């Protein structure tokens, strides 16, 4: 499937989603087929989200590339991901921040947490720690973070995530009261008490569920 992966990366470069060498290299290294269910493997390198069970999806490759480019990652950064899902996004980010960096990723659904933890370990990602918990509250134990990104949509920006950013750090999150359309917002912490935000356009993500997210029963 390496040829298919290279073709996908080339396509994303031509369409302007992959701009940097770091993101190109990361997406070329990570085997997306390892993160999708067996009956979806034939579609692993199509640019589309795919079901991974429990009502969740693996993001389309163009969205993964776009997030990685927006975050403007550097080797050695400490990053927090909310919504591990299958672990594919985490693997791409981990490739960019390298062994000197570390990614903490929080997943609320037990089955997905276990699957992702085992898969990432089997692929040798020692710079990723998978946590089972409510991602809307972040992960204060290892704060502050250089970058925080959320792979599910929140009705508002969770205060704990803002507080867990280091000064100069960035938070990327889909926000909106409509469960089928949100705005992708990039927030930068400019001082202890000040933040600035930028709206990057419309997206559609699965809902963030938890204390500071949607409350479904």
UniProtKB/Swiss-Prot annotation:
Signal peptide: none
Name of protein: Protein-L-isoaspartate O-methyltransferase
Protein's organism: Methanothermobacter thermautotrophicus (strain ATCC 29096 / DSM 1053 / JCM 10044 / NBRC 100330 / Delta H)
Gene Ontology MF: a single term: protein-L-isoaspartate (D-aspartate) O-methyltransferase activity
One example of a Gene Ontology biological process annotation: protein repair
SUPFAM superfamilies associated with the record: S-adenosyl-L-methionine-dependent methyltransferases
Subcellular location: Cytoplasm
InterPro entries recorded: PCMT, SAM-dependent_MTases_sf
Similarity comment: family membership: Belongs to the methyltransferase superfamily. L-isoaspartyl/D-aspartyl protein methyltransferase family.
Enzyme class (EC, first level): transferase
Top-level taxonomy: Archaea, Methanobacteriati, Methanobacteriota, Methanomada group, Methanobacteria
Enzyme Commission code(s) on record: 2.1.1.77
Gene Ontology CC entries for this record: cytoplasm
Catalytic reaction annotation: [protein]-L-isoaspartate + S-adenosyl-L-methionine = [protein]-L-isoaspartate alpha-methyl ester + S-adenosyl-L-homocysteine
Matching Pfam families: PCMT (PF01135)
UniProt keyword annotations, A-Z: Cytoplasm, Methyltransferase, S-adenosyl-L-methionine, Transferase
Function according to Swiss-Prot or TrEMBL: Catalyzes the methyl esterification of L-isoaspartyl residues in peptides and proteins that result from spontaneous decomposition of normal L-aspartyl and L-asparaginyl residues. It plays a role in the repair and/or degradation of damaged proteins.
Lineage: superkingdom: Archaea
Residues annotated as the enzyme's active site: 59
């Amino acid at each position: 499937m390496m040829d298919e992966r290279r073709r996908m990366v080339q396509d994303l470069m031509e369409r302007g989603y992959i701009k940097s060498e770091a993101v190109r290299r990361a997406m070329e290294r990570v085997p997306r087929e390892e993160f999708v269910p067996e009956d979806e493997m034939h579609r692993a390198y199509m640019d589309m989200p795919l079901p991974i069970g429990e009502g969740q999806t693996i993001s389309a490759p163009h969205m993964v590339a776009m997030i990685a480019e927006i975050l403007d990652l550097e080797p050695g950064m400490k990053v927090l991901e909310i919504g591990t899902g299958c672990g594919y996004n985490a693997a791409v980010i981990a490739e960019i921040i390298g062994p000197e960096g570390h990614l903490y990723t929080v997943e609320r659904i037990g089955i997905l947490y276990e699957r992702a933890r085992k898969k990432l370990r089997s692929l040798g990602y020692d710079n990723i720690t998978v946590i089972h918990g409510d991602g809307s509250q972040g992960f204060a134990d290892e704060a502050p973070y250089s970058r925080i990104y959320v792979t599910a949509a929140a009705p508002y920006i969770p205060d704990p995530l803002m507080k867990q950013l280091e000064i100069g750090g960035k938070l990327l999150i889909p926000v909106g009261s409509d469960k089928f359309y949100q705005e992708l917002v990039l927030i930068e912490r400019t001082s202890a008490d000040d933040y600035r935000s930028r709206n990057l356009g419309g997206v559609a993500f699965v809902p963030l569920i938890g204390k500071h997210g949607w409350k479904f029963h």
